[in-house]
Amino acid sequence: MVSNPMDTMTYLSLKSTGLNPKKVIGMGGALDSSRFKTYLSLALNKPQKGLDAMVIGGHGDTTMIPMHRFAKYNDEPISKLLSNDKISEVVKSTMVGGATLTKLLGTSAWYAPGSSIAYLVDSILNDKKKIIPCSVLLDGEYNHSVPCIIGKNGVDEIIELDLNELELVEFNKSVDAVRSMNSTLSSHT
């Protein structure tokens, strides 16, 4: 799923079609993670190739959670490479990146979402088993971006992160916001 509000559209598509939940995937986490990597790369003044970073949560500037605690460059935690202030700046830039681009373009982005979808499709078609944050059904009642192993069957596995207390609070706030949107739009379908 690409259309916004992406998490809710993925959820509604799943509920209205009755398709296997492992095959209904939203690309928001992949897109948001690519933006996070871009901003980290710029802050580090290093190529993206060595970066391992992801965004979980909803695909929205108030619901996404850039997971800076897990981010690494060539296996070195970014917390050892960037100051806390710089990391906070990268996180903020990531969270407003889509809105900033839309404002500059006067329309929604198309290249980065297309690239994110191509990345997902490549992992599915070639059974690459890549770990990609995707919006998938969780607990049978909402969709949210979490790291998933993506292969020929769609979502092969959902990877559970060991979130600290603050990250868990942020994730639960994000879940509540997506649930609210699901409820609002579900009542109109």
Language-model features: locations:
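Rossmann-like NAD(P)(H) cofactor-binding subdomain of soluble oxidoreductases
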Residues: M1-K37
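Long, compositionally biased stretches enriched for glycine and/or charged residues
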Residues: S41-T189
